[in-house]
UniProtKB/Swiss-Prot annotation:
Subcellular location: Cytoplasm
Lineage: Bacteria, Pseudomonadati, Pseudomonadota, Betaproteobacteria, Burkholderiales
Name assigned to this protein: Probable cytosol aminopeptidase
Functional description taken from the UniProt entry: Presumably involved in the processing and regular turnover of intracellular proteins. Catalyzes the removal of unsubstituted N-terminal amino acids from various peptides.
A GO CC annotation given for this chain: cytoplasm
Cross-referenced SUPFAM superfamilies: Macro domain-like, Zn-dependent exopeptidases
Residues reported in the UniProt entry to bind Mn(2+) 1: 279, 356, 358
Disulfide bonds: none
Length: 503
């Protein structure tokens, strides 16, 4: 798909090139119960009031989700005009813009258009500039065109014919919009990788597969990859991580991926991703219904690897280290049992009261390992708790942090990236739920505040650096008819790193 930019100030009569240029379709936004403005007004003038007549006749009322194609329109070079309802102008926010862009792409992809002129990026959205609109629109398009067909013997070819999109932007935003295209394509490629890894079955996407994926990213983009095997993990005394991996025939891997975009002495941001490639729950076995979705329990790892690919493609001026502890959580004769006590890399002993609370057991050793990089910040990403799904559903990722400044940066990035997160409490009082009579701490704290106590557990291993935890159990994948990985929170993480890099 080819994307390009053309600056245009509709208010100064600079639209001639758009009006006469050859295109299969021009996309226009129509607000509900508002007079025409911007691109819609200029094209209405060029077509001698056609848009106004269509609106007046009630064929396009501007309500959100409405679309109308106009064919063989005289006065312009495009063979079609697509009108997209935007809803009420005073309620037109980032979500409404994304909905409008998605609606437009769905309508266009169902036709045989090849080249499209897209004017929606210039709409007023929460004081965002049109370069923001370009990036959001490209991500919406790539989301609509994503298909996972790797495991089908005869995959159906793409049904759409769209190949080129020209975005009209405010002239002052033209340079930034070109950067936005590069960022959006890199983000989409990273999200596609994350989704592919999540959607692959557990018998394909094994710990070794994730390790090989990291090596491929390193080879393709000039990164440095280290993949530690069982003996090396044992030498590091990662007893907590190994307690989860011990019953699986798939050997555990500990992946470390280095991206250097800044001076070698600059402290890196460390991303840690939970990589349970299949989670049965272990001896604390999960119910059979829906267990197939536990292939998605490595989406934290997938999102970290996808983010690293995106960062490398964007060429961000920042140092980033990705750490992925990865294994399966299986039952077996040598599996960890409820009540067993294991020793973490940090030296803390952990009473494993529930083997299905395994994500925190592999993450805690990775968080300890992260200390050696003297990081500027550490962010772990995990499909950690069903309790977070109960609390926040599938819209917001749960954000926990012991550092207010870091939490603020991540929340700002989530809003900019349209990848919502909600900060959750992490009060010291919750730590009491992790007390054990027999070890330094237990791996669960009971049913109350389950997402919070899971984060509290992780916080015990993060005292030496600014730390945040993203619980993506509700946002990493969707179930039902639309089952599949979402690619989140790659946009949030990438935006955070873009902001940190000052780009």
């Amino acid at each position: 798909m080819d994307f390009s930019i053309k600056g245009c100030d509709w208010s100064k009569g600079e639209a001639k090139g758009f009006l006469t240029g050859k295109s299969d379709c021009i996309v226009l936004g129509i607000f509900e119960a508002q007079t025409l403005s911007g691109a819609a007004l200029d094209i209405d003038t060029a077509t001698k009031g056609l848009i106004s007549r269509v609106v007046k006749a009630g064929d396009m009322d501007g309500k959100r989700g409405k679309t109308l194609f106009l064919h063989e329109v005289s006065g312009i070079g495009a063979s079609r005009v697509l009108l997209v309802g935007l809803g009420k102008q005073d309620a037109f926010n980032q979500k409404a813009y994304n909905d409008a862009a998605t609606t437009a792409w769905r309508a266009l992809l169902a036709t045989k258009v090849v080249q499209v002129t897209f004017s929606l990026a210039q709409l007023p959205v929460d004081e965002r500039s049109s370069d923001w609109g370009v990036r959001a629109a490209i991500l919406a398009l790539r989301n609509e065109t994503y298909r996972f067909t790797q495991m089908k013997s005869k995959p159906e070819p793409a049904s759409h014919t769209l190949k080129r999109v020209v975005f009209s932007v405010d002239p002052a935003d033209e340079k930034a919009a070109k950067v936005a295209i590069k960022q959006a394509v890199a983000l989409a490629n990273g999200m596609d990788l994350t989704r592919d890894l999540g959607n692959l079955p557990g018998n394909v996407c094994t710990p070794i597969y994730l390790g090989n994926t990291a090596k491929k990213i390193a080879k393709d983009w000039g990164l440095k990859a280290e993949v530690l095997g069982l003996k090396q993990i044992q030498a590091l005394k990662m007893g907590s991580f190994l307690s989860v991996a011990r019953a699986s025939v798939e050997p555990p891997q500990f992946i470390v991926l280095h991206y250097q975009g800044a001076a070698a002495k600059a402290a890196p941001v460390v991303l840690v991703g939970k990589g349970i490639t299949f989670d049965t729950g272990g001896i604390s076995l999960k119910p059979g219904e829906g267990m197939d979705e536990m292939k998605y329990d490595m989406c934290g790892a997938g999102s970290v690897l996808g983010t690293m690919r995106a960062v490398a493609e964007m060429g961000l001026k920042i140092n980033v280290v990705a750490i992925v502890p990865t294994c399966e959580n299986m039952p077996g004769g040598n599996a960890t049992k409820p009540g067993d006590i294991v020793t973490s890399m940090k030296g803390l002993t952990i009473e494993v009261l529930n083997t299905d609370a395994e994500g925190r057991l592999i993450l805690c050793d990775a968080l300890t390992y992260a200390e050696r990089f003297k990081p500027a910040a550490v962010i772990d990403v995990a499909t950690l708790t069903g309790a977070c799904v109960i609390a926040l559903g599938g819209h917001n990722s749960g954000l926990f942090s012991t550092n207010d400044a870091l939490a603020g940066e991540l929340l700002d990035a989530s809003r900019e990236a349209n990848d919502p997160a909600w900060r959750m409490p992490l009060d010291d009082e919750y730590q009491d739920q992790l007390k054990s009579n027999f070890a330094d701490l237990a791996n669960i704290g009971g049913r109350p505040a389950g997402a919070v106590t899971a984060a509290c557990f992780l916080s015990r291993f993060t005292e030496s650096y600014p730390w945040a935890h993203l619980d993506i159990a509700g946002t990493a994948w969707k179930g039902g008819a639309a089952k599949g990985a979402t690619g989140r929170p790659v946009p949030l993480l990438a935006q955070f790193l873009i902001d940190r890099a000052g780009q």
